[in-house]
């Protein structure tokens, strides 16, 4: 059995893309009129990282941002600062993985 979840960019609503991390914070401009309210990240050049999810209901703020790893049964982690709000998208902080290529899906 298989299941497929397909995502697409819809201008001003959602953004699909990729980003290369280098150890420095990076702003991901999604073209939103306000910051992202949902962010899904997955590393593509390594199997060591899972599916990371942040959402505004749990809190995407400057400071600690709760996240879930979808591929585990673990509880929400609440004591990390891996992403921050950015006027038209989100910022991946330098506290997150220091390298790698990541795909993302963000919703305004």
Regions from the language model: what does each represent?
Residues 1-108:
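Surface-exposed molecular-recognition determinants
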